[in-house]
Amino acid sequence: MNDKDLEIEYLKKIDLFQRHNKHYYDKNKPIVSDQEFDLLKKDIIDLERKYKFLKSEYSPTKSIGFKPSKNFQKIKHKVPMLSLGNAFNEEDLKNFEKKIINFLSLKDVNTIEYSAEPKIDGISASLIYIDGKLTKGLSRGDGNEGEDITQNLKTIKDIPLEITKSNFPKEIDIRGEVFIENNDFKKIKDKFANPRNAASGSLRQKNSLITAKIPLKFIAYTYGYEKKMNIKNQTSFLENLKLWGFKTNPFNKKIIGVKNLMLNHKELEEKRKELAFDIDGIVYKVNDFDLQKRLGFAANAPRWAIAHKFSANSSISEIMNIEIQIGRTGALTPVAKIKPVNIGGVIVSNATLHNEDEIVRKDIRVGDTVTVERAGDVIPHVVSVDLKKRKQNSKKFIFPLKCPSCGSKTIKDYNETTKRQDAVRRCASEGFECEKIAIERIKHFVSKDAFNIDGFGKKIVENFWNLKLVRLPQDIFKLNYNKIEELEGWGKLSVANLRFSIEEKKNISLERFIYSLGIRHIGQENAKLIARHLKTASNFFRLSGEKNIESLSNIDGIGITQIQSIKKFFLNKTNLKVLSELEKNLLIKDVILINNNGLLKNKTFMLTGKLNGISRAEAKSLIEQNSGKIISNVNKKLDYLIAGDKPTLKKINTAKEWNIKIINQTEWLKMLNKSG
């Protein structure tokens, strides 16, 4: 084996080690036995000793040397710690601002002020203060619940333990980033892979004395909830944070206009290497807190903030092979297996090619020399092909016309919206009859946003599938734990933990349950809309009739595409069998509206025409916040038709025929105790 082949073999082992390391240390969910993990480390160390030119900062000789505790108590965040949407260019920012303008129905774009704050590449934390005292400190966790790491956070000098300022809120959840400055990291780099890993590992130590030895810093930047805080905007809040004893980012700015946001982004990107800490972009927040409240949240991110990432990292590599991956909805995704390369501190050996059309457009072939790009959390992808280096015997890649998993034909759906064929080719099966789809649907079923079964990750799903322990979702709730206990890497304690995690998740909300089924076009937001409409699990299980499914078209946001997908789902006999079994094994909670005593409780509304000073999206949001219900068709279930300027006459006439009350904007706002 020559030096180049040795290096490739070594980097593959490093890549595998990093993936296992993440599950072992960061997630506390090992996917291989301790023996296999130790053997892999030994292989890498032996290679380094024998061949001195083999080096990597991700080697086990340089990475974290202790295992964090599994004993941190999990606590639910009062207000979820949501992730942000990403922007990568000026067009993305323009779209972000356009959505804000449309939602708020603003006429002057220059009225929107932004707080621009550098995005530190660290670990998010939540600090709960009651009567000025730090009572609890939580990690972000999965966004809905975090771990109680109070004692470790108290070791950070930047975090005040008690605040006596008169204007400090009676109760507040201060949020910020824990990180290590680059110069401090140089002193401890032999123990950790990178500054972020150092911060993460240190915060999850059972012994806070170990955490205290690490030079952690904390910068505050927002709040989750508060009581009795009289502050009107984000920039004033940041100023008050400093008065209360917190450190804030010295590069925070107040900016108006996308062009100025872009100038600030360019300026900071040029300076980033000179900064004391790592940043990977800038977060823009609508400055005015009242506007933030009006904008609210989408499914899993605020509408009033976005993270503008810095330029992607890229590297040159060679495509060794092109493989087809099959997703839970049957989508066939081509993936380039490339020679492992380091891109922005991460070893990359796979890059997505997106779809068949993309391969044809770029004429991507096995053996090609390509530029691979990785930006933030985005999956690495092939940007371009160096045609000058193309091998003479290269052949065009032929996309499979049959599913590589089950042999069914592959199809491209006709898109009713674009009036064109989809770019994505799919397995015609789309059900549990296709092995790869079945595995991916089960992975989706147990995923974070669905059942969120702790310790039941993707590798466990694959292992249990190969052992024929799981074939359908209901099998998860009927596992043979005695058999699992005999498997390599499992023992009484790990099996008991898995059993507890599964039993704990038998109680689930209706929206999570609907989302877990992996119905095409039914994401989190649509699952929530359907759950709110149906209210009970029994109503969902009774959807199998075509007429019942058609009734979902009354939900604002559910269209023909979603209705067709739901019909297709309920026509599949295996899906019906899965639903029947899950109904027996689960306790699915009815939907209880947060504001169940709202001013519009049990009332249904429909909008027609243009409203004055408020967008249709915000009007719908206000109705739902006050326990009202939006429907999209005029029918006998409609209580009020809200008519703005230039309403649709057909809707007005139909409402009159059925004696439905027609009200104007002023009358509707009075119902909300608001002045028009």
From Swiss-Prot:
Record keyword Mitochondrion present: no
GO CC terms, sorted: cytosol
Top-level taxon in the UniProt lineage: Bacteria
Record-level GO BP terms: DNA repair; DNA replication
Residues reported to bind NAD(+): 34-38, 83-84, 117, 140, 177, 285, 309
Enzyme class of the recorded protein, top EC level: ligase
Binding site for Zn(2+): 403, 406, 427, 434
Catalytic activity: NAD(+) + (deoxyribonucleotide)n-3'-hydroxyl + 5'-phospho-(deoxyribonucleotide)m = (deoxyribonucleotide)n+m + AMP + beta-nicotinamide D-nucleotide
EC number: 6.5.1.2
UniProt GO molecular function: DNA ligase (NAD+) activity; metal ion binding
UniProt keyword annotations, A-Z: DNA damage, DNA repair, DNA replication, Ligase, Magnesium, Manganese, Metal-binding, NAD, Zinc
Domain BRCT stretches: 595-676
Stored SUPFAM superfamilies: BRCT domain, DNA ligase/mRNA capping enzyme, catalytic domain, Nucleic acid-binding proteins, RuvA domain 2-like
Family recorded in the similarity comment: Belongs to the NAD-dependent DNA ligase family. LigA subfamily.
NCBIfam families named in the record: dnlj (TIGR00575), PRK07956.1 (NF005932)
Protein name per UniProt: DNA ligase
Species name: Pelagibacter ubique (strain HTCC1062)
